[in-house]
Amino acid sequence: KGLERVSFPAEVISIIPSPSEPKRLILIRARGPLVEKIGGIAAGMSGSPFFINGRLVGAIGYGWDFSDHNLGLVTPIEEMSKAWDWQAKKGIEGGKVKFHESKNAPLIVSGISSRGAEKISRDFKGEVEVLPFDLPVGGIGVDYDAELQPGDSVGVLLAWGDVSVGSTGTLTAVDVEGNFLAYAHPFLNRGDVSFPLTRSWVHEVIPSIKSPFKLGSPVSIVGVVRQDRPQAIAGKIGHFP
């Protein structure tokens, strides 16, 4: 909860070839009392770094709805790094075949009516789950000197101010210059973008038969998302849209 980072053990089960980007995924089973308490791998944990013997191997990106939520798919870090290699073209598609669901937290919409949220949901045509929630809205400050670490909760904003629209995920890796990778799957798969990156406060992990999810809200704008690609989102902390 809050800004706390926590860890949990997981075992590798298999390596699975994927029919679309990313081309390989690592099947894991999460274990431990924390995972049992929250009901498995939650949406919004996407981007959570996965280490083997202290080495960053990748990040949790996918799972299955209405299934065993302890099972998940890790996007290898070499696949995630491809987010930096795409040419600046918008709307690049990663492939049509899906055998899993991204662990993307719902798009939280605050400051508008349920009817307005339903319209936003229709506009996205099922690309992302839209959840209206009466969280406090208003001005979100900018943290020009934010220091984030792998495992921190982060978010992407589409709107902020009197109306807030955004999602919550997890930071996977960041270098000394502030270049980062997160989510381990696309946000909206829009290609070359300029979305605010936020530090997120996690209120609670909400249990669900479909898939548990992290309920978070933005604390401050800390950087910019420049790439929204099939393997990950990427951008720079300390730079802004």
Predicted regions and their residues:
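Terminal presequence/propeptide segments associated with secretion/organelle targeting
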Residues: K1-P241
